[in-house]
Amino acid sequence: MAKTAMAYKEKMKELSMLSLICSCFYPEPRNINIYTYDDMEVKQINKRASGQAFELILKPPSPISEAPRTLASPKKKDLSLEEIQKKLEAAEERRKSQEAQVLKQLAEKREHEREVLQKALEENNNFSKMAEEKLILKMEQIKENREANLAAIIERLQEKERHAAEVRRNKELQVELSG
């Protein structure tokens, strides 16, 4: 059906060109209402302002073409034992080659997976080392800050102690002078 529709489209494209060429060779007017081809007939139904209408009549296939066409297959020659053996050996070689290729691909895939895993482990170790170093550095800073704060507190306490000792001494001097 699709082939017939395609053939119809091609014939319709050729139709106007065909009528032009025919008018050059045959100056007398032709009946343009009917066109006949090998396997179809096209009749013009009527002309309209919007276009033209055609009736397409498909002819049944001719009885000659109905005969089944059988293609003569090439005659098979008798194969000798040596030829059969050669074909079997060639097939075995192909099988071994394919098997070796599959094994090679699997080995390459495993190697790639191993490399990816190794790289991931190295990155994980590097990350762990960097995190540990950052943590140690942070702990050292906290320890230094704590020691600095403790030293500042001790300094303030010692300053208060000196001030208290000075106040006591001044008080004792006042008591001695007044007394």
Swiss-Prot record:
Tissue/organ expression: Neuron specific.
Post-translational modification: Sumoylated. Phosphorylated mostly by MAPK8, but also by MAPK9 and MAPK10 in the developing brain cortex.
Stated family: Belongs to the stathmin family.
InterPro entries: Stathmin_CS, Stathmin_fam, Stathmin_sf
One CC-aspect GO term: neuron projection
Region Regulatory/phosphorylation domain, annotated ranges: 39-96
PANTHER family named in the record: STATHMIN, STATHMIN-2
Species annotation: Homo sapiens (Human)
Record keywords, A-Z: Cell projection, Coiled coil, Cytoplasm, Endosome, Golgi apparatus, Lipoprotein, Membrane, Palmitate, Phosphoprotein, Ubl conjugation
Protein's UniProt keywords contain Acyltransferase: no
Name of this protein: Stathmin-2
Coiled-coil ranges from the UniProt annotation: 75-179
Membrane topology, from the record: Peripheral membrane protein
Residues recorded with modification Phosphoserine: 16, 50, 62, 73, 97
Annotated GO MF terms: calcium-dependent protein binding; tubulin binding
Origin organism lineage: Eukaryota, Metazoa, Chordata, Craniata, Vertebrata
Role description: Regulator of microtubule stability. When phosphorylated by MAPK8, stabilizes microtubules and consequently controls neurite length in cortical neurons. In the developing brain, negatively regulates the rate of exit from multipolar stage and retards radial migration from the ventricular zone.
Lipidation (S-palmitoyl cysteine): 22, 24
Quaternary data: Interacts with MAPK8. Interacts with ITM2C. Interacts with KIFBP. Interacts (via the N-terminal region) with CIB1 (via C-terminal region); the interaction is direct, occurs in a calcium-dependent manner and attenuates the neurite outgrowth inhibition of STMN2.
GO biological process, one term: negative regulation of microtubule depolymerization
Location within or outside the cell: Cytoplasm; Cytoplasm, Perinuclear region; Cell projection, Growth cone; Membrane
Region annotated Membrane attachment, chain positions: 1-26
Residues in SLD domain copies: 38-179
